[in-house]
Amino acid sequence: MGKKKIVTKKEGEADAGPKARSSARSGKKHVSAGTLYVQSTYNNTKLLLTDKDGNALAWSSSGAIGFKGAKKGTPFAAAKVGELIGEKAQNIGIKEVDVVVRGVGSGRESGIRAFISKGIELTTIKDRTPIPHNGPKPRKPRTV
């Protein structure tokens, strides 16, 4: 076994959780309304915040904040992503958002709930999950 490194925290230092991301860019632009795109798959949850023209203001995903493997697809990870994007939206000055949801993952609802818990008003929710019109053959069901 090798040596163990012991890290001592000083006063005033706060634990930022898994991989705290700096949002240095997010303070520059001030927008009052925007659109939140939620892409939720079985393996990951991604949130993208744009202005009304579609220009990206902030984004994050479960993998980007430090979750690995199967934990990325959990509702808890999606809630953490929603909180992070909600804080970035507050810094930008967003007051109301439209939500567009894509995918069938378990983080759909919890990501949105965590986002609106930051005090941002939700105007509409649209479900734009892609549905094939008899495209390629789907995956076989998983056997457990």
Task: Cite the ranges covered by each PLM segment.
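Ribosome-associated RNA-binding proteins
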Residues: 1-144
